[in-house]
Each structure stands twice: as C-alpha cells, then as structure tokens.
C-alpha cells in the first residue's frame, strides 16, 4: 500500500480535530477566557511559576511527554498489521489522548497548577487522594523501567551508539554552565545552542571512528553494565541542579525531536514507501512472537503513549500549568502537543511496516524464536552491512525503528551513502527522546515520593534537604533499576503499558468529577467514554498478563523474585486505580444529588472578580 494518500488523510484528520473538536472543548466545555488569571501570573515567583511564550511552553511540554512510547509501542504493535495500530493511534489520540491531556491541563490550571493527586484530593476526597499519590509513585517506577529497558536494548553491544549518547552528557554540562552561569544575571541562548548542535554532530561522526578503533571494546557493553550506567545517570540527573544537566539536555533534545519528526514526515511524503505488512496478520488472534496476546486488549497497552498516556497527566499537572501565560493557550499546548505525539507514533508504525516482514521479525525476536516462525530474512545481511551493526535479535523496537527510518532516508537522492549515519542518528534520536523523560521522570518520582513520605515524617517533604533528596532519588532509581535488571521487553512493556493506561483512567475519572462538581455534568460524557474504554481494555490486559506471564514467573525457579514483584505491582496498581475510579463515580452521584463538592472555587479574573462559571451542581437532563 502506498503511504502518501494514507499520510495525507491522517494529517487532515488531525487538522480537522484540532480546528473543531478542540475548539468545542475550549469554548463550550472549559469556557477558556484570557481574563482569567493563570497560575503563572497569580503565583509568579521567577522559579516554578513563570509566564512564558506559548511556543516555549509547547516545546517544554512536548519534550516532557514525548518519550519512548510513540516510537516503541507502534513499532511492536506492527506485529498485528498496520490497520489496528493506525486506527487506534488516530482515533485514540483525537478522542481520548488529546482530551485527557487538555482536560488535565485546564483542571490543574483551575487548581492553581497543582498535581493530579492534589486534584483527586480536592474533587473526590482525602482518602482517595492518598491512594492516587501511591498509584502515581508506582506508575513512575514502572514507567521509568519501561523506558530504560528500551535504551538498554538499543545501546547494548553498540560502541557507536553508546559513545554518541555518552557524549551528550558533557555537551549538556557545558551548555548548562554557558547558558546560566557564564554571565551572572543573564541567560545566553544563541551561542550555546549553536555549540550544542555542532558538538552533537561531531559526536555522531566521532562515534563512527571510535567504533572502528581499538577504543571500541570500551564501549561494547552488555545489558547489565548499561543498566548500572543508566541508574547512576538517573540518580545524578534527579539530584543535580536543573540548570546543570536537565534543562540544557531538554532544550537541546527539543530541537532534535521536532527537527527529526519534520524531516521524517517530509521523507515519508517524498519517498512514500510501500507498506509491506498486511493490514492484519495472523497474530491478531494471539500467539505472536513479540506480544503473545490477542489484538484486544494488548494492542492498546502496547501502543500506550502514542494514543493516550497517563504519564502525560503528571506533566499536564506538573510544570506546564505553571508556565502558561494566557488561559486560551492551553488548547494549543494540551490538545496540540498530543496530536504531534500521535503523528510520531504513526511515522514509527509506517517505518516498521515498510520493512520486509521477515527482516522485521528477525530484528525484533530472539534468533531461537525466529527460527520457529517459518520466515526468512530478505535484506537483513545487506541492512547490517549498510548500518555497520549486527541487527538480528536486537529486540525492543528501537533498532527496527532506526532501520526503517534509515531505509526511508536511503530513498532520498544523495542520502544512500549516509545510511549508517541515519541509523545511528535514529538511535541517538530515540535515546534522547527517552533519557529526557527518564531524568525528568525520576525527578518527578522523587517529588511525589517526598510528598507521600511527608505524611510519615515532615522533613522528608523538604526539597532543600540533601539527605531527603538523595534517599528519595535512590529509592526510585533502585526500584526501576531492579525491574530492568531482571526483566525483558516482553515482561516490562506490558506492565508499563497497563500502569500507564490505568493512570490515564484515573486522570479521566478525576476530571469527570471536576466537570460534574463545577456544573458541567452535561459534558461529562467527553471524559466518561474514553475512561470506560481505557479501563475495560487495560483491566483485561492486566488480568491476562498477570495470570499468563507474571504469576507463572513467580512459581518458576529462577524467576520467583521478579515474578512476585511484577505480580504485586500490577495488582496494587489495578486495585488503586479501581478505588479512585469508583470513588470518583460516587462523588459525581453525590454532587448530582445536591451534596456540595469538596472544592468549588471559580477562576479569578484579572480585575479581582470571579469568572461567571457555575459552581453549583445541576442535573444533565
């Protein structure tokens, strides 16, 4: 199938959804009004609450939400064929994912930029808020493990890739000092940005030289060695001042992310590769070598972030609402950024499905499993020679995405000789996608864990306490590091996808309670329908994964500990999610019966009055 008309249709759907559906949400449901004072202005402290230009906020928000999910999930879901993945990526993002992000962002802005657990506490109740806080800590740990396993598989036994990624750390440190400390009182942007771009290009070129030299053995590391390096990196990145590593790395990666996505979209439209996968494969009925379950429900937890992501609710109720200058800009940032991430997922699926079927499975499953599939690789040896890396058995998704991306650019005139560079640039692109989320996510996990421990011992809540920061960061890193050390993409990714989707259901149910509590019950169906669908698919996947994978691991000698940990994590998160969702539903019923909601303050206008939005409940019919 030719991808050109397909891509034009998909981009058209995104444009129509943004133009009309997001406008309906902004005007009719949320009644966004630039007269409302945003938290960035109300609490402007020059540190956390800072009114910022909308393009700057969009870049920050997109860099924070765009991790491995839209790249890896659709690539793995190609096992089912291109049709199921494309349908869910587009429909899920338009009707569920973008609604989830937009609603959570506006809800947080109306709660002074506070977090999702705080909104649960305010709109549903204190006990449910505590459950949500615990669920968020568990989700962060699982999410970091899911992202880290992808990086481990991408960098394992690849001197070129590991050297290039390693060099981004000193580059970011130099940029951080140059931008924020070289001239006290000023923040430099242009010169450090030029330096970062040039240094990154030189690191990519130098990686090729290192891989062919005697230094290659230093960077040819196995999975466990890379896990240790990632844990050390995550610990340092979450405890160092944000200006030193986190901010410059995010800033640099944003340009690379957006530039690469634009280049890949242009490449797909220019080359318009033919999809070599069928619309549906035999694995839609189960028994697949990558994802053993059926297309329902495992497609939805596999694609995860590309269509809807609960992790986004932590960003939409974290730093982003503290930066928005005008309330109407939430539409562009909340709804628009999710559509761009969905487009990334579509491009990843196209890149995977444009490969030969035999080559795709030869890369994404272990050789022993591939030998039983009855398939033969067609271009694998040639591709390995072109990219300068062994490709067979490089499971996890990132390598096959990089191969698909390199093949697309191979078809652009003048680019054929640069295939190996495009491949390793794609690995760099993916790793930067993921590492920016790992360092930010570990820091978010530290904040939430300290907030939780505050209920036990007050000093834990102080972010100025070095001991508290080190202990909380160390705990988060050890937890996700343990999961990665003994896990695989086959066990961790379903766990990540399930926890991530359940967090989305928690956020949507909380936002439903918020709408009902604030007199918008007539529009509650906008969040109830996606919440119900996500909950049904995810609970089904959780039960099947636990009974079919994690519990058998817990009863098998050699994997008992890992199996028990993953069984307990999955069970705990499911129970926590169900508690929050049930109590959110009960809160809605109470409000509709006239019981006053816990929180019913309307937004404050710039002239000191309150916005004329109904705080009293009303019935929807």
Q: Which residues does each PLM region occupy?
A:
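Membrane-interface helix-loop-helix modules in multi-pass membrane proteins
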Residues: 52-111, 122-126, 139-161, 334-359, ...
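A generic transmembrane alpha-helix motif of multi-pass inner-membrane proteins
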Residues: 1-17, 194-243, 247, 252-253, ...
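Hydrophobic, membrane-embedded alpha-helices of multi-pass small-molecule transporters
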Residues: 53-69, 220-240, 266-273, 285-325, ...
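Loop-to-transmembrane helix boundary motifs in multi-pass membrane proteins
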Residues: 126-141, 336-343, 416-426, 431, ...
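Extracellular loop-to-transmembrane helix junctions
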Residues: 2-19, 23, 77-108, 117, ...
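Flexible loop linkers connecting adjacent transmembrane helices
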Residues: 23-50, 74-76, 86, 90, ...
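Selective recognition of specific alpha-helical transmembrane segments in multi-pass small-molecule
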Residues: 10-20, 136, 143, 198-202, ...
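Membrane-interface "cap" regions at the ends of multi-pass membrane proteins
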Residues: 17-71, 254, 293-294, 298, ...
């Amino acid at each position: 199938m030719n991808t050109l008309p397909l891509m034009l249709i998909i981009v058209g759907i995104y444009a129509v959804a943004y133009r009309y559906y997001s406008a309906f949400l902004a005007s009719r449901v949320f009644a966004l009004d630039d007269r409302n004072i945003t938290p960035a202005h109300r609490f402007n402290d020059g540190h956390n609450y800072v009114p910022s230009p909308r393009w700057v906020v969009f870049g920050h928000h997109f860099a924070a939400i765009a991790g491995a999910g839209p790249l890896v999930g659709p690539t793995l879901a190609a096992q089912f064929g291109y049709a199921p993945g494309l349908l869910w990526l587009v429909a899920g993002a338009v009707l569920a994912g973008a609604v989830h992000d937009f609603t959570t962002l506006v809800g947080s802005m109306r709660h002074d930029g506070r977090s999702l657990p705080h909104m649960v506490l305010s709109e549903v109740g204190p006990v449910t808020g505590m459950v949500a806080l615990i669920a968020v800590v568990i989700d962060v740990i699982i999410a970091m493990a899911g992202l880290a396993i992808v990086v481990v598989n991408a960098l394992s036994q690849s001197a070129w890739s590991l050297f290039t990624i390693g060099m981004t750390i000193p580059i970011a440190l130099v940029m951080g000092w140059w931008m924020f400390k070289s001239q006290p009182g000023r923040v430099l942007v242009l010169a450090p940005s030029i330096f970062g771009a040039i240094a990154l290009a030189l690191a990519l070129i130098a990686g090729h030289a290192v891989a062919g030299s005697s230094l290659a053995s230093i960077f040819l590391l196995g999975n466990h060695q890379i896990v240790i390096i990632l844990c050390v990196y995550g610990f340092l990145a979450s405890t160092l001042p944000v200006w030193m590593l986190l901010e410059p790395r995010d800033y640099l990666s944003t340009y690379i992310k957006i530039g690469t996505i634009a280049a890949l979209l242009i490449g797909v439209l220019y080359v318009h590769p033919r999809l070599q996968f069928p619309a549906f494969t035999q694995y839609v009925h189960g028994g697949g070598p990558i994802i053993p379950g059926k297309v329902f429900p495992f497609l939805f937890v596999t694609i995860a972030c590309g269509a809807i992501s609960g992790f986004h609710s932590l960003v939409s109720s974290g730093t982003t609402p503290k930066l928005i200058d005008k309330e109407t800009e939430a539409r562009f940032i909340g709804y628009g950024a999710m559509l761009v991430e969905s487009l990334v997922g579509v491009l990843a699926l196209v890149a995977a499905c444009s490969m030969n079927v035999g080559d795709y499975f030869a890369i994404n499953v272990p050789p022993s499993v591939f030998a039983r599939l009855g398939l033969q690789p067609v271009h694998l040896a040639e591709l390995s020679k072109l990219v300068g890396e062994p490709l067979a058995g490089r499971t996890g998704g990132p390598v096959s995405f990089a191969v698909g991306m390199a093949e697309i650019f191979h078809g652009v005139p003048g680019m054929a000789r640069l295939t190996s560079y495009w491949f390793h640039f794609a690995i760099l692109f993916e790793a930067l996608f993921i590492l920016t989320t790992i360092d930010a996510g570990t820091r978010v996990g530290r904040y939430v864990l300290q907030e939780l421990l505050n209920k036990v011992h007050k000093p834990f809540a102080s972010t100025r306490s070095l001991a508290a920061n080190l202990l909380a960061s160390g705990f988060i890193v050890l937890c996700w590091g343990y999961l990665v050390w003994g896990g695989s993409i086959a066990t961790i990714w379903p766990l990540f996808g399930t926890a991530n989707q359940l967090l989305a259901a928690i956020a949507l149910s909380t936002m439903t309670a918020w709408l009902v509590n604030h007199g918008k019950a007539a529009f509650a169906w906008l969040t109830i329908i996606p919440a119900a669908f996500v909950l049904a698919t995810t609970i089904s996947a959780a039960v099947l994964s636990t009974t079919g994978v994690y519990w058998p691991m817990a009863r098998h000698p050699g994997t008992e500990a890992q199996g028990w940990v993953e069984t307990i994590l999955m069970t705990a998160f499911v129970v926590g999610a169900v508690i929050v969702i049930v109590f959110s539903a009960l809160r809605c019923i109470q409000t509709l019966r006239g019981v006053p909601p816990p929180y019913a303050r309307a937004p404050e206008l710039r002239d000191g009055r309150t916005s004329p939005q109904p705080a009293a409940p009303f019935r929807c019919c």
